Amino acid sequence: MSPKNITRSVIPAIDLYCRKANFKTLKSLSMILGSKKEWYDTKKAPLRTFLVSRCGIFEQLRGRLVEDGKVNLFSVFLTNDSFSFCKMTVDDKFNTSLVDWQKIPFDSTFATDRRQNISLLPVDTLFATEKIISILGVSPNMTNLVSIERERSDLVDFNCKLQSNILEHLLYAKCQGVYVTSTNEKARLLAAVCNPEFIDTFWCELTPIRVSLKENPSISVPREYQMYDPVVRATIKEVVTKRLLRSAFDNDIDPLMCLHLDKGWKLKFPILSSTTGLNFSLKDCLSLDTGKDASDMTEVFLATMESSKVLRTYSNLVDIVMKDNGRLDSGVLKQFNDYVKQEKLNLQHFQAGSSKFLKGAKI
């Protein structure tokens, strides 16, 4: 039978159209699906394989969203002395609502036997992992995706790195395919490891920086700063977080990057009532102690927002490739290519909006 006449399920259909797309389209697809990895930039086959495997996660979410009408998205960021997390709910219209957003210190309540800190004993790390899951507030009646990231700074000592690594592995294992209640036929708790490179690319890589950095009075040699510099990316991510919060607070919703804040959240952010634009500090807005705390909270916020936007993009791609039950069609291939191109342009347009705020940022 001709390949054109073969019907396919979703993932094989996506794989087919990825095979037929050119390399440039695949690179753009990796960006809009929050999966861009620099070391795949010269080889089509491993990039396609990686993208299709990533789509498997979002296919599970998409299916649950169709069935249940809502899903919960979580992002967790582990450090040696705390964890930050963000929870958002996405409905079947891809409306995204902020539900929870906290930074929790690893105090004595995360340790056993009245110890003041988490030890590397299995009983301690397992206890801490289960406590993290209980704090997240997963719903037994909804599908919950938990994206997990850990601190990777070279400045952290070996034991601290080891603790974060162990907690990351245990949290992933505890969340992957868990049946929250014994009567559920489908796993309600899913897990994914969040690569910080994906977050940086999705929110930062297309941001024009050169002109704005030249006009920044705090920078004496703008050429010394490049997009790959951690300080530049951290600054852009802070700007993006403030943009999204301001838009949500003012109900000035970008249809592609919308976030809903209910009245309760708006009362928690009084500084947004007394300021305009981005003239506020995330540290003060979130009542945090340090800039590092604000950076950690930014990371989980943007990771969760990225997941919600990628889920929408992925679902639209599925609608395209399944128009004729997954059959190969030149018209569908053109729609596939055009959609990927347009979504990248939309992302580029959004990122360009961050550029002007770099002029006054402290870098």
From Swiss-Prot:
The UniProt record lists the keyword Mitochondrion: yes
Primary localization class, coarse: mitochondrion
Keywords: Mitochondrion, mRNA processing
GO molecular function: crossed form four-way junction DNA binding; DNA endonuclease activity; flap-structured DNA binding; RNA binding; Y-form DNA binding
Pfam families membership: Ydc2-catalyt
GO cellular component term of the entry, any: mitochondrial matrix
Disulfide bonding pattern of the chain: none
Superkingdom in the source lineage: Eukaryota
GO terms of biological process kind: Group I intron splicing; mitochondrial genome maintenance; mitochondrial RNA processing; mRNA processing
Record localization: Mitochondrion matrix
Quaternary structure note: Homodimer. Forms a ribonucleoprotein complex composed of maturase bI3 and 2 dimers of MRS1 that assemble around the bI3 RNA.
Physiological role: Function in mitochondrial RNA splicing in the excision of mitochondrial group I introns aI5 beta from COX1 and bI3 from COB transcripts and thus would be involved in obtaining the correct structure of the intron, to allow the RNA catalyzed reactions to occur.
Further information: Present with 5240 molecules/cell in log phase SD medium.
PANTHER family: CRUCIFORM CUTTING ENDONUCLEASE 1, MITOCHONDRIAL-RELATED
Protein name: Mitochondrial RNA-splicing protein MRS1
